[in-house]
Amino acid sequence: MSEKNQLQVEAIRHGSVIDHVPAGQGIKILKLFQLIETQERITVGFNLKSGALGKKDLIKIENTRLTEQQANQLALFAPKATVNIIEDFAVVKKHQLELPEFIAGVFHCPNSNCISHNEPVDSYFRVREVKGVVRMKCKYCEKSFTQDIVSERY
């Protein structure tokens, strides 16, 4: 393989590749979506060269196929990312991300008075984009927050 075609992060036989993640968001995605808790091998590249982004992060998860719903939740941090499903070292499906209608069990509500902090319920937010700003509305306290406020503690 010539130097020009050499992969910056090792290829995987089967699994999912999260590509075109803005530089610096990869670690947040690993933590928030608990990807580091899997027993499967994860290969990560930070600040890799990217023609479109300048620099990007890349996450490869072996033997794990992200669902469309899981992939779309990533759009909160990497709206231009793609999730590629790999089988026998080849891309068999490429998923362009879309903001999900809701996101459950990932974030904690920033409202300290919200019942989701004291009751055995999963967090649940409706997601909306208004004039380019992503807002998340808690199902329980009905307060709206920007995506960066909801995710700032991660």
From Swiss-Prot:
Pfam families: PyrI (PF01948), PyrI_C (PF02748). It comes from the Bacteria. InterPro entries: Asp_carbamoyltransf_reg_N (IPR020545), Asp_carbamoylTrfase_reg (IPR002801), Asp_carbamoyltrfase_reg_C (IPR020542), Asp_carbatrfase_reg_C_sf (IPR036792), Asp_carbatrfase_reg_N_sf (IPR036793). Keywords: Metal-binding, Pyrimidine biosynthesis, Zinc. Zn(2+) binds at residues 109, 114, 138, 141. The keyword Metal-binding applies. One of its GO terms (molecular function) is metal ion binding. SUPFAM superfamilies: Aspartate carbamoyltransferase, Regulatory-chain, C-terminal domain (SSF57825), Aspartate carbamoyltransferase, Regulatory-chain, N-terminal domain (SSF54893). Its cofactor is Zn(2+). Belongs to the PyrI family. Involved in allosteric regulation of aspartate carbamoyltransferase. HAMAP family: Asp_carb_tr_reg. This is Aspartate carbamoyltransferase regulatory chain. It comes from Aeromonas hydrophila subsp. hydrophila (strain ATCC 7966 / DSM 30187 / BCRC 13018 / CCUG 14551 / JCM 1027 / KCTC 2358 / NCIMB 9240 / NCTC 8049). The lineage of its organism: Bacteria, Pseudomonadati, Pseudomonadota, Gammaproteobacteria, Aeromonadales.
